[in-house]
């Protein structure tokens, strides 16, 4: 996990990890972030496309952006922590 100091985005690199590890790492990063803090999750597990939006809805965080590379092998999610 790294922090981009220019934009205050915490980056969670979950490449190579399988369910449920990417969401567990995301949950930990969100818990440590301040309200309105941004967390970017980068993952290769295709189940994150289903799990991350559900995680955000369930815990009422804002999914700002969701992208996949052209091959669909790399997934990126930008989440804003809500109060």
Where are these regions (language model features)?
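Right-handed parallel beta-helix/beta-solenoid
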Residues: 2-14
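C-terminal edge-of-domain segments
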Residues: 69-83
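Amphipathic, hydrophobic secondary-structure cores in small proteins
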Residues: 12-68
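Residue-level marker of intrinsically disordered, low-complexity segments enriched
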Residues: 7-10, 62, 77
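A general secondary-structure signal for short beta-strands and their flanking turns/coil
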Residues: 7, 36, 72-74
């Amino acid at each position: 996990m790294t922090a981009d100091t220019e934009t205050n985005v915490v980056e969670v690199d979950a490449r190579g990890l399988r369910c449920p590890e990417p969401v567990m790492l995301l949950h930990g990063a969100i818990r440590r972030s301040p309200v309105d803090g941004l967390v970017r999750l980068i993952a290769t597990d295709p189940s994150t496309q289903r799990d991350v939006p559900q995680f955000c809805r369930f815990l009422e965080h804002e999914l700002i952006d969701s992208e996949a590379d052209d091959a669909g092998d790399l997934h990126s999610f930008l989440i804003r922590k809500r109060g």
